[in-house]
Amino acid sequence: MKKYLVGGAVRDRLLQIPVKERDWVVIGTTLQDMLKAGYQQVGKDFPVFLHPKSHEEYALARIEKKSATGGYTGFTYKASSEITLEEDLKRRDLTINAIACDENGSLIDPYNGQRDLNQRWLRHVSEAFCEDPLRVLRVARFAAQLAYLNFRIVPETRLMMQHMISELPLLSPERIWKETEKALATRDPQIYFQVLRDCGALKTLFPEIDALFGVPAPAKWHPEIDTGIHTMMTVAMAARLSDSIAVRFASLCHDIGKGLTPRDHWPSHHGHGPAGIPLVQSLCQRLRVPNSIRNLAIIVTEYHDLLHYAVKLKPKTLIKLFYAIDVWRRPERLEQIIIISEADARGRAGYENHFYKPGQFIREAYRIASSIMPCQVISHNLTGNKIGEKLRQYRQQAIATWKQQNYESKQQ
């Protein structure tokens, strides 16, 4: 039995990136031998085992062959003690992921992965790359993950990705979302969507986002003009401001309604917030996006523009906004929405380093409103809904007083 460290652990070690998890491939052994050695089998589709002590994954070397269209269900696998390391590595997606390291630290690199690491290329290992359409998303995700190191996709791999678009609808929603979620967690999530657009996959997988490219916005507010470009800039800014997947996904969706604006109304997009809600719902339902992420995206789509004008809003409107986004039961949601609105404001050409004043105002308004406690209302011998109504009135009055003293009086 020979064991080799493979995949991302080897790649990241060579790039001097912290290794998060380690995967191993085992050569010259059988399923029965692994079980006798105390390994626990966990793979259903092919033999994957957990080490009895480290609990790291060990997989028998295998080869695979496409037997039908689609994702994993379209493959047949063969794992045996006779399969070589080179055969196992050949089935992998990119050369930089097809490097192995033996127990002595020696590298086995039959497909020139080290060369591509040094030259910062994302390159497919073999023609078998095109057999799994998920690899289009994986390459886009690696492009986002390694963009800060200046990795690029080689033209040959880009061309192959373009030829795989027709099979993307066969992917399960779970696989699409899993790759998208990983991409949203990278330093440069906007690169993922840009790569998908460049190869034609965005129109198939995210038509609501693809429709934003070429849609103009007023140059006065959006020097970058193109709504699709602005959306990518907003996602990039959101990634700078927050690690939250929910925040980053909501920033992707925030202007989705502008794709519905009739051409004769361009570049204005009145009512694009509420108009975008059904699109967000449809997108999230199609990809089976978790409810918590979906709910934030819907709220942001509807209300993000309102925050930009927060200082001009009447106290009644501010309170209505706070209740609409349920801030007293979900206080974390307000900060998420402020961050996304800031990303929206700074995700514009020339505004990247601007201070977002409405954020400070909204936080202070919420603090003032939250200083009014339910116990201050209950003492008025009110019952039922009247308690909530009175609490709302008190909070509105507190904001009105604070706003008049700190903002309106200074403007006079």
UniProtKB/Swiss-Prot annotation:
It comes from the Bacteria. Transmembrane segments: none annotated. It catalyses: a tRNA precursor + 2 CTP + ATP = a tRNA with a 3' CCA end + 3 diphosphate; a tRNA with a 3' CCA end + 2 CTP + ATP = a tRNA with a 3' CCACCA end + 3 diphosphate. ATP binds at G8, R11, R92, R138, R141. Mg(2+) binds at E21, D23. Comprises two domains: an N-terminal domain containing the nucleotidyltransferase activity and a C-terminal HD domain associated with both phosphodiesterase and phosphatase activities. Belongs to the tRNA nucleotidyltransferase/poly(A) polymerase family. Bacterial CCA-adding enzyme type 1 subfamily. This is Multifunctional CCA protein. The lineage of its organism: Bacteria, Pseudomonadati, Pseudomonadota, Gammaproteobacteria, Candidatus Palibaumannia. The gene is cca.
